[in-house]
Swiss-Prot record:
GO terms for molecular function: FMN binding; NADP binding; NADPH dehydrogenase activity. Belongs to the NADH:flavin oxidoreductase/NADH oxidase family. NamA subfamily. Its cofactor is FMN. This is NADPH dehydrogenase. It catalyses: A + NADPH + H(+) = AH2 + NADP(+). Substrate binds at residues 28, 164-167. Homotetramer. It is an enzyme of class 1 (oxidoreductase). FMN binds at residues 23-26, 60, 102, 215, 307-308. Catalyzes the reduction of the double bond of an array of alpha,beta-unsaturated aldehydes and ketones. It also reduces the nitro group of nitroester and nitroaromatic compounds. It could have a role in detoxification processes. Keywords: Detoxification, Flavoprotein, FMN, NADP, Oxidoreductase. GO terms for biological process: response to toxic substance.
Length: 345
């Protein structure tokens, strides 16, 4: 029997062996605080690849040192960081998966001893520092940093690049009227608030012709914030610029209460897919193979991003295959142990 979850998916010239994506999740494990990959990262990502994930996405990787969430984040702001990332993508490829990287700038949510930077001098909450409002030169330099990071990603051997435009980090801060109070060409109207991301996408496209994803927060969960309908407009512009897939998350641009339940963000992937006619990824409390298969069968998304469930079990694809009754081909090293994986569920 055929299952969509385990069917190939092609984006441009990259074919994923299945629809299961390892969602980018910060590990805060660059122990020397220099942005470098460590042995932990090789094991962490290589294990998920061996577990038969179709696309392993490296966590939010800072395009500038001041763009880290913490001082133990991975970085891609210098050429000396390429080698470790290349080792990581090689590990991923050698274990049968494609490799992606999420390029990021934390903006006002950077928790470092140095200044944080944002579109406006508004802190995320009363616990965090007031950020420095970026001037136009700093905006230009940050756009350039994303472009250089994309070029380094290419040299590091990634197959897919994702821009982190969600969860209240810098790109998201420019998009949302809750965090962007500028009165110049980067603030005010939706077109102006989109300008920063537009310039980043244009800059990345100059050096990268592979698949390009953007992660969005499709709902600010605030009466004066953005909704999924606002993102229909934004993602329409992204599509015009050549973005291939929208990774649909939500929230975290301002403190908010969010009611979570299994698949609570799938509605956003479905809405964007239907109204913009662009490929989408569903993410958020997707924990079983049958749930993931139903999302695909209902045409609510094209890819399934799995986060915490892959932290709980790096062999989630095997568990999902067992549940669905699909015979998943194991790595040749493990073929002496065929059959179902037993679980406590």
């Amino acid at each position: 029997m055929e299952f969509q979850l385990f069917s190939p998916y092609t984006i441009k010239d990259v074919t994923l062996k299945n629809r299961i994506i390892m969602s980018p999740m910060c590990m805060y494990s660059s122990e020397n605080e220099d942005g470098q990959v460590t042995n932990f990262h090789l094991v962490h990502y290589g294990t998920r690849a061996a577990g038969q994930v179709g696309l392993v996405m490296i966590e939010a990787t800072a395009v500038l040192p001041e763009g880290r969430i913490s001082n133990k984040d991975l970085g891609i702001w210098d050429d000396n960081l390429i080698e470790g990332l290349h080792k990581t993508t090689t590990f991923i490829h050698n274990n049968g998966a494609k490799a992606a990287i999420q390029l990021a700038h934390a903006g006002r949510k950077a928790e470092l001893e140095t200044d944080a930077f944002a579109p406006s001098a508004i802190p995320f909450n009363d616990r965090m520092k007031i950020p420095v409002e970026m001037n136009k030169q700093q905006i230009k330099e940050t756009v350039s940093a994303f472009q250089k990071a994309a070029l380094r990603s290419k040299r590091a051997g990634v197959d897919v690049i994702e821009l982190h435009g969600a969860h209240g980090y810098l790109i998201n801060e420019f998009l949302s009227p809750l965090s962007n109070k500028r009165i110049d060409e980067y603030g005010g109207s939706p077109e102006n608030r989109y300008r920063f991301l537009r310039e980043i996408i244009d800059a990345v496209n100059e050096v990268w012709n592979g698949p390009l994803f953007v992660r969005i927060s499709a709902n600010d969960y605030h009466p004066d914030g953005l909704t999924v309908q606002d993102y229909v407009q934004y993602t329409g512009w992204m599509k015009e610029q050549g973005v291939d897939l929208i990774d649909c998350s939500s929230g975290a641009v301002v403190p908010a209460h969010i009611d979570v339940y299994p698949g609570y963000q799938v509605q956003y992937a479905k809405h964007i897919k239907e109204h913009v006619n662009i490929a989408t990824g569903a993410v958020g409390l997707i924990t079983t193979g049958s749930q993931a298969e139903q999302i695909l069968n209902n045409n609510e998304a094209d890819l399934i991003f799995i986060g915490r469930e892959l932290l709980r079990n790096p062999y989630f694809p095997r568990i999902a295959a067992n549940e669905l009754g699909f015979e998943l081909k194991e790595p040749y090293q493990y073929r002496r142990a065929p059959g179902k994986i037993k679980t406590n569920k």
